[in-house]
Regions:
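Solvent-exposed loop/turn segments at secondary-structure junctions
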Residues: 60-62, 90-94, 105-108, 118-122, ...
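A non-catalytic alpha/beta surface segment that caps or lines the substrate-entry region
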Residues: 40, 49-106
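Hydrophobic secretory-pathway targeting helix
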Residues: 4-36
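Alpha-helical transmembrane segments
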Residues: 21-24, 357-375
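Active-site-adjacent substrate-binding region
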Residues: 211, 218-344, 348
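Cytoplasmic C-terminal tails of single-pass
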Residues: 374-383
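N-terminal capping segment at the start of a domain
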Residues: 26-71, 288-303
Length: 383
């Protein structure tokens, strides 16, 4: 039986190719997985207080004084952590206003948008008793906005570690479609913002906006997130798995309700512009579900849960730790693959290609050198 004899030079050739190749693979982060050591700072109680603050202004219906006062409240709170920008526009003859807060403005190469609407619906049309009364909007409006404010505080604390620019956007005129306010459609405030993104980007290209994360009805009791057709499914599944890893399996079920693209929410306009987007939203269509207060007067503080606010906020906080804080600073140092759309071959694949070419050159050079050596040795023996 023939024996295969391992030759040291063959092992050397293999290693000269393998070492630079694997080093490049790991350094680019394609398979990198880190364990973050950063503590979770999000406080559901603080977010709950921010919901209460918003409700204290009254019904935040577009064009009303409570809506204006609530926008000023956001601006005052955000000014502690971010650069504040007004976005004023008119819809159907009514003055509307989005509020933008920019954290880490110098990190212009990578931008993540966190959004929520803050207007409350003018008519509680699903309410069996008072369908013409306005909705308090504790969950559908105030909850997502409250989580944004608390995340602004949290991320400000670690701003020097975050390798990303974060936009906190509070949208007006989201919840007035189908008869809420005469002439209004759904999510018109966010549509205005998405159409005019370049105005806020200035000289920064649209490609710098890597991700849009929307929070809609995230503070109600019995939190159970759904999925939809406008959301990037791969990124959303990453969030669902992250939530389960944090112990929030009931909020991130393996069999969530699925909305098709018929769901019109604020993230739709960003997804339509090619920005990967994720909607954190519940199944609000089931009257016998865990939160049956959608577009009713029951959407009040009595049906808000600090646990739900904690789950939402801490899952998002951990996400940023893992993908936008380096391992050196206690983060996960993972690769935000959604940020490489259109540029992948210039970054990761390019690095791999260079590594392969380098490895191939080393192998070829080693083979040629070995052949030259053996040929010379053979000639010496002949002499």
């Amino acid at each position: 039986m023939a024996r295969i004899r391992a030759r040291p030079w063959a092992i050397f050739i293999f290693l000269t190719w393998l070492i630079p190749f694997t080093t490049t693979i790991w350094s680019t982060g394609i398979f990198a997985r880190g364990e973050t050591t950063l503590p979770l700072l999000f406080k559901g109680d603080t977010a709950y207080s921010a919901i209460q603050d918003q409700l204290n202004y009254g019904n935040r219906i577009p064009g009303t004084t409570p809506r204006k006062e609530c926008a000023n409240y956001f601006k005052s709170e955000l000014a502690q952590y971010a650069t504040v920008i007004d976005h004023n526009y008119t819809l159907h003859g009514i003055a509307c206003q989005n509020v933008l807060g920019v954290l880490n403005p110098t990190e212009s190469g990578s931008i993540v948008i966190l959004g929520a609407h803050y207007d409350s619906r003018a008519k509680a049309d699903k309410d069996p008793i008072s369908p013409d009364s306005p909705c308090p909007g504790a969950n559908d409006g105030a909850a997502g906005s409250a989580v944004l404010l608390e995340l602004a505080r949290v991320f400000y604390e670690i701003r020097t570690k975050l390798q990303v620019q974060i936009w906190f956007v509070f949208f007006d005129a989201e919840d007035q479609g189908s008869g809420g306010l005469s002439g209004f459609g759904w999510a018109e405030g966010s549509q205005e913002f998405a159409i005019n993104l370049e105005t806020f980007l200035g000289s920064t290209p649209l490609s710098a906006v890597k991700l849009m994360l929307l929070l809609d009805m995230v503070g109600g009791t019995g939190l159970r997130f759904a999925k939809d057709g406008w959301t990037n499914s791969e990124i959303q599944e990453l969030f669902f798995q992250l939530g389960r890893d944090l112990g929030y399996a009931s909020a991130f079920p393996t069999d969530p309700h699925y909305f098709s693209k018929s769901l019109i929410d604020d993230h739709k306009w960003f997804a339509s512009r090619g920005i990967p987007s994720v909607d954190f939203i519940i199944d609000f269509t089931d009257p016998s579900g865990p939160w049956p207060y959608h577009h009713t007067t029951g959407d009040n503080l009595a049906h808000i849960s600090t646990d739900s606010l904690d789950i939402t906020g801490k899952t998002l906080e951990r996400f940023f730790h893992e993908y936008y804080v380096s391992a050196v600073d206690g983060g996960g140092g993972k690769n935000p693959f959604w940020g490489m759309t259109g540029d992948w071959f210039l970054t990761e694949a390019g690095a791999i290609l260079i590594s392969c070419v380098f490895g191939a050159c080393v192998v070829l050079g080693t083979i040629l050198a070995f052949k030259a050596y053996t040929l010379k040795k053979h000639e010496v023996l002949k002499e």
